[in-house]
Structure formats: structure tokens, C-alpha cells
A protein has these predicted regions:
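C-terminal auxiliary extensions adjacent to catalytic cores
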Residues: 2-24, 28-35, 39-42, 47, ...
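Glycine-rich, flexible loop motifs
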Residues: 2-51, 81-134, 228, 243
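Hydrophobic alpha-helical context, especially transmembrane and signal-peptide helices
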Residues: 49-53, 131-137, 151, 172, ...
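Short, low-complexity, polar/charged sequence segments that are solvent-exposed and flexible
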Residues: 73-76, 120, 213-215
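Conserved, non-catalytic sequence blocks in retroelement Pol enzymes and Pol-derived host proteins
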Residues: 113, 142-144, 374
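Cysteine-centered functional microenvironments
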Residues: 136-141, 318-322
Length: 495
């Protein structure tokens, strides 16, 4: 199928999920094509008639903004910009993020406010549709002036430079372009700056983090419900009336989800000896709910961002204006990444506490969830693993957005550090997925000690699928294998 990049309607996270899942081919709408061409024509005419320097178009960049560049060197200026700014370091950015970077850069340029050539946007679409993913590096962006270094690496293949991942192999971009019958592009005035100035590195991470976070929010409720039954917990804390009198949206959603997940559970319905449960069970709606509300806020920030123009300077043909502003500054994203990381990390923190309770030898469960504790260590050490991951997340949740380091001789004297916030948040979310997998392994084991009583039909169906991969553990075995298998089950679980 094809997906039309259109400026007449917003693109949502749901749209992006559909594009990714359906492996859609991108095309530009007629209106987007007209906008791009009209903006470029306006700039060409403006350059021919105006002698006053325009930042980034016929001047240097950053603190070199007062250096005027002669007309016969403008194309070289743009090529030099891309080459000189491609100085990333560290690990290669995951291909799933690079794919999103291409998509979001195309989306931003389609508004016709950046004065790029139509063929430049077409070539970005060619890269996306042919699954030619530029090699980009994690380190190098300050999250202001756009994601300069990552976007420079993203743009190098347009010039026949740099490296790409194509068909699973790391190749020279020039070789792949030739193989596909594509010629390198010669950048015209302003184009290099339009390609590099933008927040698409941060935004791509944001889209990925939110798509994953939405799933983790649902998973946490489902796995938390399994743990509640495994722990022989009470149902009263999830009744609707207690949440209606404190009606935070996420709290209400979570309580409803727990009730639905446990509907029909024989374990939940049996008489209880204990008067109340620990907070990690009793307060699931309040804790998980707060994370849902935080995720919803961050979602609104990024849906605004991916439907924005974050180039500089910005070209307004209809107003006969070229404005040097600051839409490239990533502060809204940096703060949101820090917020999301903290919120999602709490799903992992409370999950580890439930694991600790399950292995503690209370509620008629054997110590460490194994029939012969002592001879067997059982589920003792997976909790250690969970604790180490929770601790790492606490370190990763130190805010990046409160930091700023002056750059470019003081011209760029405040930066967001949003790119660092993005890569940290990505790691936190990966860690929480592991923590929920550890909880599922423990909770499924605990449920077996409640037999012959059954949990809810929904949970029993899930556990039946789970047991096809990971059987009940009677005696000690290499737990790494069980943990990895559980993680893959969680990653591929369709909920």
C-alpha cells in the first residue's frame, strides 16, 4: 500500500504505526509537491533580486553568520556544511529509528517552508521506499540548532557520500545509489541547512518511545493482574467507586483494566485471609495510572512536533518573508523525554517490588517459587537482575534537559540536550520491557501454586500460550534461557 504525505491533515502516531506495520510506500500529495516547488522558486527569485545577506543562505553558520558567501560558492557552502557536520560518534542508531528519521524529515519538508528542491525530497523518499538506511551515530547532537550531526549523517547519501545499511549489509552510499540507478544530488542554496536544521533525530526516538510505551502501559496492567492473582491479592482496591472519587484519567483506566483482566478469576473470588495487600499490588491504579497520564501528555507534545516545521531560517513565500527563528530548539522534546523516562521507569520499579513479594515465601507460596528451596535457588536471582535494572534506570532518569553547554562561540548559548534525553529514554524503555518479562516469568510460576483454582479466562489463555514456550520450573536450570524466551514472548505479544 501507499501512504500520501499531505500537508492538509496531521500525521498521528497511529498513522505512523500503520505505515510501519503495513510497510507502506511513501508518496507526496499534489499539494505538498506544489508547496515545495513554489517555495524553492520564491527563494531563487529572492536571491536574484536581493543583495542583503540572508542567514544560512549566503552566509556562514553559527558564529560565522556575518561572513558573506559569494554566489559562485553557494552550492559548495551547502556541501561543506553537510560534510563538516557529519561528526557523530558512539553506537550506530538502530535502523528502526533511522527509518523514522527519514519519514519525519520528509514530513517536515513537505510543508514548503524550507526552500529545498523537489528532487531532494524525492530522493529522501527513494531512500525510504528502497529501505536504504543511512548510518547515523548516537552521539553528537545538542538538541538545538536541530540535530545537526545525526541529520548530517542522514543526508550524506543524498550526495553519494557516507555509508548506508542496505539489505542487511553496511555499504558505501555511492555503490547503492548506482545499483538503484540514482544520481547524487547537487544541493542548491539553503538546502544543506534545511536538511540539518530540524528535530527529526529527537522526534524519531520520541515516536519509537511512545509507540513502545503505549504497549508497556497495557502490558504492565496485564502482568500486574497475573501477579495479583499469583499473590492471592484482594479485589476491593480496584472497585470503580474508590477511583471515581479521585478521578485521574489514567487511574480510572488502570482500575478498569485490572478488573477486566481478572474477570472470572476463581483465585480472586476465593475468601481471603489477609486484610490488605502491599502497595505494589494495592496501588497499581494510582502508580500505573500516573504513568498513563504522563504518557498521554508526552504523546501530545510529539504529535505537535512531527507536524511542525523545525527548519531555520524559515521561508514564507505568501508573506514575502524569510525569518531566522528558533523552531529547531528541542526544549519541548527534552523535557518530555525526561518526563516519559521517569514515568515509564516507575512501571519497572513497582514491577520489581511485586516480584520481590512473590518470591518472599508468604501467602502460601514457597520461598523463591520453587518446591524444594535450599536444594534449589529457584527464582532468587532473577529478582537480583530486576533490581540491577531498576537501579540502572534510576541513573538513566537523571534529567538531561536541565543541562546546557555553550557552543559556537556563544552564538548558541543555550541548548536542550534533548538528543541525550532521547537515547536515555530509549534505554529506560528497553529496560522496563525486560522488567515486565521478569515479572511475567515469576507471576506465571506463582499461579501454578494456586491450582486447582484458575485465574481469569483471559489470563489462562495467555498462560497457555506462554507455557508452550516456557514450562513450569520444578528444579534449578539455566534461568537466562527462560528470561530471554520470556522477553521474546513479551515483545511479540499482540495486545
Amino acid at each position: 500500500m501507499t501512504f500520501s504525505i499531505s500537508t492538509d491533515k496531521i500525521i498521528t502516531l497511529k498513522d505512523i504505526q500503520h505505515i510501519l506495520d503495513s510497510n507502506a510506500t511513501l508518496v507526496l500529495s499534489v499539494k505538498a509537491k506544489q508547496n515545495i516547488i513554489a517555495c524553492r522558486e520564491y527563494l531563487d527569485k529572492k536571491m536574484a533580486s536581493q543583495k542583503t545577506p540572508i542567514y544560512g543562505i549566503n552566509t556562514g553558520f553559527g558564529s560565522l553568520c556575518n561572513v558573506v558567501i559569494p554566489d559562485n560558492e553557494l552550492e559548495q557552502l551547502q556541501t561543506n556544511l553537510v560534510m563538516s557536520h557529519a561528526c557523530g560518534m558512539g553506537n550506530e542508531v538502530p535502523l528502526e529509528i533511522v527509518r523514522l528519521m527519514l519519514l519525519l524529515k520528509i514530513q517536515s519538508l513537505s510543508y514548503g517552508k524550507s526552500a529545498v528542491q523537489f528532487q531532494t525530497v524525492e530522493r529522501l523518499i527513494d531512500l525510504y521506499n528502497h529501505k536504504v538506511y543511512p548510518i547515523v551515530y548516537e552521539q553528537g547532537s545538542l538538541g538545538a540548532s536541530g540535530d545537526l550531526s545525526p541529520l548530517a549523517h542522514l543526508s550524506l547519501p543524498l550526495l553519494g557520500m557516507g555509508e548506508v545499511n542496505y539489505q542487511g549489509n553496511k555499504c558505501q552510499a555511492s555503490v547503492v545509489l548506482k545499483q538503484l540507478g540514482l544520481e547524487p544530488i547537487t544541493l542548491k542554496s539553503k538546502e544543506g541547512l534545511a536538511l540539518l536544521n530540524g528535530t527529526q533525530f529527537m522526534s524519531a526516538y520520541g515516536v519509537w518511545c511512545l509507540l513502545k510505551s503505549n504497549k508497556l502501559n497495557t502490558l504492565a496492567d496485564l502482568i500486574g493482574a497475573i501477579s495479583l492473582d499469583g499473590f492471592d491479592g484482594r479485589s476491593e482496591p480496584f472497585k470503580d467507586n474508590i477511583h471515581i472519587i479521585r478521578p485521574h484519567k489514567g487511574q480510572l483506566q488502570t482500575a478498569r483494566a485490572i478488573r477486566e483482566n481478572l474477570a472470572g478469576s476463581e483465585i480472586l473470588a476465593q475468601a481471603k485471609v489477609q486484610v490488605q495487600d502491599p502497595y505494589s499490588f494495592r496501588c497499581i491504579p494510582q502508580v500505573h495510572g500516573a504513568t498513563k497520564d504522563a504518557t498521554a501528555y508526552v504523546n501530545s507534545v510529539f504529535e505537535t512536533e512531527i507536524n511542525s516545521v523545525t527548519d531555520n531560517p524559515t521561508v514564507f513565500p505568501e508573506d514575502d518573508e524569510i525569518i531566522s527563528g528558533g523552531n529547531f530548539h528541542g526544549q519541548p522534546l527534552a523535557i518530555s523525554f525526561d518526563f516519559l523516562a521517569i514515568a515509564i521507569a516507575e512501571l519497572g520499579s513497582i514491577s520489581e517490588r511485586r516480584v520481590y513479594q512473590l518470591i518472599s515465601g508468604t501467602r502460601n507460596l514457597p520461598a523463591f517459587l520453587v518446591a524444594k528451596p535450599g536444594l534449589n535457588s529457584g527464582f532468587m536471582i532473577p529478582q537480583y537482575t530486576a533490581a540491577s535494572i531498576v537501579s540502572q534506570n534510576k541513573q538513566l532518569c537523571t534529567p538531561a534537559s536541565i543541562d546546557s553547554i555553550v557552543s559556537s562561540n556563544g552564538q548558541e548559548d543555550h541548548v536542550s540536550m534533548g538528543a541525550n534525553a532521547a537515547t536515555k529514554c530509549y534505554k529506560v524503555i528497553e529496560n522496563v520491557e525486560k522488567l515486565l518479562a521478569i515479572e511475567l516469568l515469576n507471576a506465571s510460576q506463582a499461579i501454578e501454586f494456586r491450582r486447582p483454582l484458575k485465574s481469569s479466562p483471559k489470563i489462562e489463555n495467555l498462560l497457555a500460550d506462554f507455557r508452550k514456550l516456557i514450562p513450569f520450573i520444578k528444579d534449578d536450570k539455566i534461568m537466562y534461557q527462560e528470561l530471554e524466551a520470556t522477553l521474546q514472548f513479551v515483545k511479540t505479544l499482540n495486545i
